[in-house]
Amino acid sequence: MVKEIYGTKVGMTQIFDEKGVAIPVTAIEVKPLTVVAKKTADKDGYNAIVVSFGEIKEKNANKPHKGIFAKAGVDVQKYLREIKVENVDEYEIGSKITVDTFTTEDSVDVQGTSKGKGFQGVIKRHGQHRGPMGHGSMYHRRPGSMGSKTSTILNLNVVKVDADKNVILVKGSIPGAKKSIVRVRKSVK
């Protein structure tokens, strides 16, 4: 059984529960993942499946990338990711993994790349006050690049799973800009 999938962040909205209370949710679009290869404990030291997703023109893919898809006999896609599984025999090469992996009772962890802020000063980057400037102050952190780091939000509730539109709605916000790739996995804690 797969415990994680990959999708793209669509954006935030709100839905209303039975009592009329607004719930802020983030929509994640999960196109079906295609199983491209299997990794076994005998050959590779661990059990995993290699999945692909995302559209790309075949002429824009590099030769090693094309070779993986030619060996599997499936159409070329943009991204390749590994998902650890307990039993690789449950999956056939070319089969699809859909959004039905999750239900509304699940709690998930969402991992993505935070929005990049560029070069920022210490007040914005570290939340410092100006403090004493001279006379040998030794605690000043330095300005520098902020954001564009991998970030994980733990224990978000799945509010709705729409298999027809390939969308998961999770309660709250998740890291990243719109159209960024996110990893959704069942909570580990």
Which residues does each PLM region occupy?
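Extended basic (Lys/Arg/His-rich) segments that typically form rRNA-contacting surfaces
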Residues: 1-189
